[in-house]
Structures are given as C-alpha cells and as structure tokens.
Amino acid sequence: MKHITGAYFSPTGGTKRALESVCSLFEGETELFELTGPDKKGKTFGAEDLLILALPVYAGQRPAVPGLLDSLKGDNTPCVILATYGNRHYDDALAQIKREMGGRGFRCAGAAAVITPHLFA
C-alpha cells in the first residue's frame, strides 16, 4: 500500500479509538481523516491506496448524516470497513456500507464489527 487513510465519524470517540487500534496493525504512517471535520474537502484515492472507514451503527444503520461520505472518491481503491456498535446488533450495516462504498469507487477488502461504548447506553 502506498498510503493508508483512516476516515471516521465518531461522536463519542469510541469509533475513533477502534480505528486507531486497527490502524496500529499496519506498518508506516496512517493519516486520520474526520468525515465531519473542518477539513472536509474531497479526498480521491487510487488503486495503490488503502482506506479504512470507521462508522458507528445505530439500529442497524450507518448514521443518517447528510453528505457524510460525499468527500470520499475511489478508483478501484481497497477499503476496509469498520462498524462499531453498542447495545444492539449491527444487522446488515456492513453490507449496506460495502454497497455504498462500491458506488464511490472502492472495493471491500475486509470488514469487521466492533463493540464499543454506545452513545445511548
């Protein structure tokens, strides 16, 4: 991989901590990109890059934040999806996110659901 980016939405910090743990498994530097942060400019990724996308799941769905993933554009870019959840099952959120990311030019290379403290706990 030429470059690894960890993109995340983490209202309570748990999803970001889970992402940081996964990113620490890779050699080299990983850039973290907050999807709702002030630097929301578009990011374009190539086939030699890796995106690790971390999102919380509420009631089996990714957050319904308008435009949350609009800044991510891939070109047959490998993507690892990390879904965090708390008090309820994540249902088919990984499959939903995989489909959405496929439409943005990413191909899913892996996925995981991780339990973290939940916003509504």
Q: For each predicted feature, which ranges?
A:
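FMN-binding flavodoxin-like domain, especially the glycine-rich phosphate-binding loop
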Residues: 2-5, 10-121
